[in-house]
């Protein structure tokens, strides 16, 4: 069980945070760019080409399961490698369709276009912001860590690279990590000379378990949001 976002742990690799207890709040984001149709309504864009997505998205192809898995994997791997536990809780604060209407109980067909999830990972308060219709420019695709000492760490995807920032008042340190997320995941976890299988074979099953737990939790949120199905 894999998710390419689980390789986005430069915060850990660059030792920007000492341990998980240094974090007071985490925000996770995946806010995708969108277009507009002839009726002036927001439409999804193809991830690879940027062209309008011709598919009609239906549940379960909404943001909670489709892209929530990416953000949750990134947050949990970051917390885990900072010494945190695998404990997590989440609830749906809001879930809306493509046109901004709340998903109703009993609706088993409409896909969520936007959702706000809230909970804790290893005891740290977490908010996850998912949006498939975030406008022409989209929004942040990564995380934001608020540290106990007042510093902020921002992790984003910009074009063909990841951008990591350490923000202290008006001072910003910035690192650029080129390459696709798939490349980093394959090299760091699967096929590379220092893959997870080589570095820590026992961690493979634990990593798999975390990915399965995340999908199970998001499926549970759908049951709570829509009713048993």
For each feature predicted by the language model, list its residue ranges.
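Phosphate/oxyanion-binding loops and surfaces in catalytic or ligand/nucleic-acid-binding neighborhoods
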Residues: 15, 33, 78-82, 218-224, ...
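C-terminal helix-rich "cap/oligomerization" subdomain common to oxidoreductases
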Residues: 94-96, 188-229
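A structural signal for well-ordered alpha-helical scaffolds and beta->alpha junctions
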Residues: 5, 9, 68-75, 112, ...
